[in-house]
């Protein structure tokens, strides 16, 4: 009983930490003009990706070495750099619509970039032998809720900073991409 409670607490803390990545990206994405329905949908998609990426990581964690997790983190960082730069350039050019919108393939790109780190964690948890269902449900739940909070807060910040919101959102994504590529 205590062992299960300890694992639940540990996985919840881990899920919250990974969800903060989704919050940060949501904050940047929220500065793009989004409808409430899109915000709900984006949160759901990112939550689902945060369930499947660690699941895939857990399943392959027993087969592959740790280098794949590091590679996934670098790919995620590079994607966020590109997305952030694109948002900044679009803002400078005064383009109304971002080049990569958070719908369709653009949303898959956003969700993939923010959930690649959960794949890396899944690799480690797969080797450790963590409870699969508890892990993926907690990861999905926390990332979905924190994405919604980030998107809603980003939408509010957008109304405060006006035309600079796209550049600010791009800077947030760019900074987060740099953080993934060059951890302290």
Curated annotation (Swiss-Prot):
Annotated membrane topology: Multi-pass membrane protein
Keyword Manganese: yes
GO cellular component, one term: plasma membrane
Entry-linked InterPro entries: Mntp/YtaF, Put_MntP
Pfam families in UniProt: Mntp (PF02659)
Listed transmembrane segments: 12-32, 39-59, 63-83, 99-119, 132-152, 164-184
GO function terms (MF aspect): manganese ion transmembrane transporter activity
Alphabetic keyword roster: Cell membrane, Ion transport, Manganese, Membrane, Transmembrane, Transmembrane helix, Transport
Signal peptide region: none
Localization: Cell membrane
HAMAP family linked to this entry: MntP_pump
Family that this chain belongs to: Belongs to the MntP (TC 9.B.29) family.
Function: Probably functions as a manganese efflux pump.
Name by which UniProt lists this protein: Putative manganese efflux pump MntP
The gene coding this protein: mntP
């Amino acid at each position: 009983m205590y062992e299960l409670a300890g694992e639940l607490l540990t996985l919840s803390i881990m899920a919250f930490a990974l969800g903060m990545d989704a919050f940060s990206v949501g904050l940047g994405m929220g500065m793009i003009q989004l409808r409430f329905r899109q915000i709900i949908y984006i949160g759901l998609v990112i939550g689902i990706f945060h369930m499947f990426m660690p699941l895939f990581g857990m399943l392959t964690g027993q087969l592959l070495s740790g280098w794949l997790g590091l590679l996934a983190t670098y790919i995620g960082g590079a994607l966020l750099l590109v997305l952030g730069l694109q948002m900044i350039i679009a803002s400078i050019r005064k383009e109304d619509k971002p080049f990569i919108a958070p719908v369709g393939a653009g949303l898959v790109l956003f969700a993939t970039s923010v959930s690649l780190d959960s794949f890396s964690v899944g690799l480690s948890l797969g080797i450790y032998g963590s409870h699969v269902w508890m892990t993926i449900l907690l990861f999905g739940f926390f990332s979905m809720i924190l994405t919604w909070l980030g998107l809603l807060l980003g939408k509010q910040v957008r109304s405060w900073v006006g035309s600079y919101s796209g550049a600010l959102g791009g800077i947030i994504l760019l900074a987060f991409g740099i953080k993934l590529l060059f951890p302290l």
